[in-house]
Amino acid sequence: MKKKQLKPEPYMMNRELSWLKFNERVLNEAGNPRVPLAERLTFASIYQSNLDEFYMVRVGTLMDQMESSEVVRENKTNMTSKEQVKAIIDATRELDIKKAVIYEQLMGELEPQGIRSINFNKLSGKEGELLETYFDNEIAPYLSANIISKQQPFPFLQNKEIYAVALLATKGGKTKTAIIPCSNNVFKRLIDIPTRPGTFM
């Protein structure tokens, strides 16, 4: 017997989307000029940590449900797992744009306090050489690229770790996708620029 699909009430909201709205309020505190600067940085960090765990737990569960032969629907809005994942990704894209704007604001407000984050292309030639030497000595020896191909299984990705995705050129002129682990236990998140006190990259 086919199950009857219930029509969602207009006042009902999907739990996952409701949670993203909550996390947006955390992000709003990071952008609130009435909140002390140090606390705003904390709110920005909490927002991202919350989002990482949300994707790890809740989105991971929805992805598992999508693999099931039975269509699973959320009991308040009648959304399928696939519909929920799409809605979550769409909402997250909007939040990412908002987060980028707030991040730039925070970085701008940190500069008068003597703390600066700088992009590599804004370094002088000498500073660039110093960081290239640092990369060659302190980072490159620990890098190990996992090539994505049909011949190899997709690499296992650890939770709450940072990975870089790169396109590698082959001798034949083609490109291959590689995933590079960037462990927090091996690499420093911030590298200070010796020639500019209080400046990091």
Which residues make up each language-model segment?
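N-terminal non-catalytic structural scaffold regions of very large proteins
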Residues: 2-201
